[in-house]
Each structure stands twice: as structure tokens, then as C-alpha cells.
UniProtKB/Swiss-Prot annotation:
Subunit and partners: Monomer.
The record's account of how the chain is modified after translation: N-glycosylated. Contains sialic acid residues.
GO annotations of cellular component type: extracellular region
Single biological process term from Gene Ontology: proteolysis
Name the record gives this protein: Thrombin-like enzyme BpSP-1
Amino acid sequence: VIGGDECDINEHPFL
């Protein structure tokens, strides 16, 4: 899952 702040920063550190 690639979202951003919504996603878990630990799992998906994408902004």
C-alpha cells in the first residue's frame, strides 16, 4: 500500500 502520511510510516515510509 502506497499512500503517505495515512499509511504506517514504519511499514511504508513514503511521503
